[in-house]
Amino acid sequence: MYPNKNSQQTFAEIMLVSVTLFWGATFPIVKEAIELLPVMAFLWIRFALAALLLGFMAGRRGFATLDYRGWCNGILLGTLLFLSYLFQTFGLEQTSSANAGFLTGLNVVWVPLLAGPLLKKPAAFGAKVGVIIAFSGLILLTWHTPWTLNPGDLLVLACSFFVALHILGLDRFTAGYDARALTFVQIFTMAVLGCIGSLIFEPVSWPREWPLSLVSAFLITAILATAYAFWAMTRFQRLTTPTRAALIYTLEPVWAAIFSVWLLDERLSSLAWAGGGLIVSGMIFAEAWPLLRRRSSGVEPDLKMN
């Protein structure tokens, strides 16, 4: 299908870009949906629909690639994903979808910092500078008088940490397994955890009417932002590096802000836009630093290098 490794990696990275588009678009969609349905109820229904689709796509042949370790890997990855969505969706109740998009994108700074202790790859100078730049942006984005962090912002910040763990986990635990089957295990795990949490913590009162906006939210988030997105991540992220993948994911908050302004008519102050720009700049600096360093030393960069 691909003439060489570079074109294979390029195609994989284009697929990951499409993932960020669908994720960014769902921020305003989910924000409206959780006004009609409790958070965990919305999550488990979304994930259950996506799991049904993925299970059908994987088929018997796909599940045959999963051994005991494969199932355990999928459950672990699914648990990390569930925690990220839980913190993000609760955070959306208390902050703007644009803020949530930018803050979720901070996972790209966590990745190189966590890669040191978890994958024995210490953080580079660029990652440390990126953290400083992004943290400055965080202060501007969430600035109030007097300055405080919105509780919703803190929840989404926790979400970004678990997203980073999931990115690192995909790099380590997915090789050798059918992407659709392994993604099914992840999403099914999320559906089960969400259902249990909803039954325990949420007195669900189902809407008397299911408006088109809620039905559309389920279909869009289940099919495009869950089934397709995590299949694409599981299938294609291993064809690039965690660092390059994390850099691509910096597009998510940009899409989130664009769709939030377009669909919800949200308005960000110039200070907030500047903060969001600094966050994205910090993300890009952290991930582009190795490439810039190799070029300045006259070494031809290898796309597959960290």
Model regions: which residues?
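Hydrophobic transmembrane alpha-helices of multi-pass small-molecule transport proteins
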Residues: 54, 75, 123-143, 159-163, ...
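Specific transmembrane alpha-helical segments of multi-pass solute transporters/efflux pumps
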Residues: 22, 26-27, 55-104, 140, ...
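Glycine-/small-residue-enriched transmembrane alpha-helix faces in small-molecule transporters
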Residues: 1-41, 79, 87, 145-172, ...
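C-terminal-most transmembrane helix of multi-pass membrane proteins
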Residues: 2-5, 47, 214-216, 250-306
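Hydrophobic/small/kink-forming positions within alpha-helical transmembrane segments
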Residues: 21-24, 28, 55, 78, ...
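Hydrophobic alpha-helical transmembrane segments of multi-pass integral membrane proteins
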Residues: 10-15, 41-56, 76, 126-133, ...
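Helix-helix packing/entry segments at the starts of transmembrane helices
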Residues: 43-45, 86, 100-106, 170-192, ...
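C-terminal transmembrane-helix exit sites in multi-pass transporters
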Residues: 53-62, 107-129, 254-274
